[in-house]
Amino acid sequence: NVLPPGDRLNIDALAERLGVSPTPIREGLARLAAENLVDFRSYRGYFVKKMLTPQELTDLFDVRKVLEIHAVRRGAARPGMSRLVEMERLLYEMGGPNLEPEFHEYGRFSILDQRFHEALLGLAESPALLDAWRALNVHVAASRFFRSSGLVDVQHSVTEHAAILGALVAGDTDAAVRAVDVHIDAGLRRSLAGSPTPVGPLDAGVEPFVPNEGPM
């Protein structure tokens, strides 16, 4: 079951549902609160974190863009074949024959999307950079899920990912930066619109890398 933003988290009810004692539930919620993933209110308990405001979401996307563009500029000149192959494999899974342009398997898509971007961040070979991105992405992914009711924009995300990968394969750092910029801006606009409908240009000015017959 999905608890809507702002709902109170009942420790005893959660413990009963999960078949555990209240202690690990309480400890887990305390840790989530420390990481700003749930809200704690004195004398009232824990609550599902409220949905980010449009400005808060915009701020997170802005920081995410800075991190990803930095990773591209730092590592695009020497990405390594194994990393490109991994990104190509993930791209194929996101846009493979078993997925429709729009579908409700948000959890599956979210995992693939996160792994693609983690591979992109890996270009910088900086654990600190990757950790910072992951901390942001938790909130971005949750907000996107609630705003879109779990419906994800597979087709357009794959197109944008393909432009990023195409630029990296071509060794064009500037084009890769433009592709990341376009993708993050388009993702923000779609998230704010609460719909998978494209609301911005998808063309980053590079030839996309499109896997038609499966990964390399």
Each PLM stretch: what is its role?
Residues 68, 113, 172:
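Acidic active-site catalytic centers that drive phospho-/nucleotidyl reactions
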Residues 54, 65, 88, 155-159:
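Amphipathic alpha-helical repeat elements characteristic of tetratricopeptide repeat
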Residues 6, 49-52, 100-101, 145-149, ...:
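Short amphipathic alpha-helical segments at helix-loop
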Residues 81-146, 158-167, 175-185:
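Conserved amphipathic alpha-helical segments that form helical-bundle/coiled-coil interaction surfaces
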Residues 146-216:
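C-terminal regulatory/effector modules of DNA-binding transcriptional regulators
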